[in-house]
């Protein structure tokens, strides 16, 4: 539908029963209200598109929904002030991820398997592709230069978009995992701001990878 001033005052209804851990199907209605301070231009659409984060509200009581992660974060920050320990808390999560060139999986009555591949995987040393001569050894992928670091340019694209969308980046580099493990570090910020940024960060990483015909995952140990 068309956005107008009323849209932002009344909010946008959605089915809370379709969000795991939110509502039962017999009382599923919830409301999203946009936080306009989070508005960004999302570059991953063919047409110019704005995106913003929202807070969840109960449509009956018009109060903040108790299970909304942003609402919980705001209450945690408010509680901190009441303790007298501090007025502000800063977080600087070290978000790491893998960039893979191919992933497939299958689960059936007679089969269960998964397959992961990376242009940097040491297991590709027997390939006829000349570029596969440059492969990181097992657990020796920390800070290599190209051509060992084959994901540098993709990470640089991610960083460029992150900074355009308001995320301050301190450093990016290859990580120890030789098969495409990467790290892009954000500068620390307040709890809510950082929580919002992590969601945007993941959105950017996955979409830039997809643009390059790759797949990014934040699974902790897809490779051992």
Question: Which residues make up each language-model segment?
Answer:
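ATP/Mg2+-dependent ligation/transfer catalytic cores
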Residues: 1-170, 191-200
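A short glycine-rich, hydrophobically flanked beta-strand micro-motif that places a catalytic Asp/Glu
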Residues: 94-96, 170-174, 215-223
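Short, conserved phosphate-binding/catalytic loop or strand-edge motifs used
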Residues: 95, 175-184
